[in-house]
Design a protein with these regions (language model features):
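Conserved active-site tyrosine of GNAT-family acetyltransferases
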Residues: 100, 105
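Short amphipathic alpha-helix that is part of the acyltransferase structural core
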Residues: 1-26, 39, 126, 145-158
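A conserved beta-strand-loop-helix scaffold within acyl/acetyltransferase catalytic domains
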Residues: 18-67
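Conserved GNAT acetyl-CoA-binding A-motif
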Residues: 84-99, 111
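Conserved acetyl-CoA-binding loop-helix of GNAT-fold acetyltransferases
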Residues: 65, 70-84
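Conserved catalytic-core motifs of GNAT/GCN5-like acyltransferases
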Residues: 90, 106-139
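Extended, charge-rich low-complexity interaction segments
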Residues: 137-147
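Short phosphate-engaging motifs
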Residues: 56, 70, 96
């Protein structure tokens, strides 16, 4: 696992996000200090997690594993690298929900007032971006599945 992020890694990440309509638009994918990536023996990216500060904790806002490498525990490896006092993740993916539970995350209903304010601002901006880029397929998918997204949170003692 590495924090090194090449242009090819970014291209791979965007291609993964293109097919995962639950995630933010691939045009918003970027290199970040908070990103973690797993590469195979040939240095090809096979899994990625992005973490964003949400004022009242950190959000796992995308976690992707290449379909050819699923079932190998890569999401567990990524989750073990996510650090912070308060970490949360919204997902409707049952495999990720299972991995989150195994990593000590618990189902919650509310991320906190400051985190909610931050999420309201950022999700509104992402929605506006999807409108501007005419990403109606992603908008439709996310609105249709909105009630199915579940919040998981882990609070680490300091």
């Amino acid at each position: 696992m590495t924090d090194d992020f090449s242009d090819f890694d970014l291209f791979w990440l965007k291609s993964m996000m293109e097919n995962e309509l639950d995630l933010r638009p691939p045009t918003l994918a970027k290199k970040s200090r908070a990103s973690k990536i797993i590469k195979d023996d040939q240095e090809n990216p096979i899994a990625h997690v992005a973490i964003t500060n949400r004022w009242q904790g950190s959000e796992i806002n995308s976690l992707v594993v290449d379909p050819a490498h699923r079932g190998k525990g890569l999401s567990h490896q990524l989750l073990s690298r996510v650090i912070g006092a308060r970490i949360f993740c919204y997902t409707r993916d049952e495999r990720l929900q299972s991995a989150l539970r195994k990593a000590g995350y618990r189902r919650k209903k509310f991320p906190g007032f400051a985190a909610s304010a931050n999420l309201l601002l950022t999700r509104t901006a992402i929605f506006a971006w999807m409108l501007l880029t005419l990403d109606f397929k992603r908008i439709s998918h996310q609105i249709r599945h909105l009630p199915n997204y579940k919040l998981y949170m882990k609070v680490n003692s300091e």
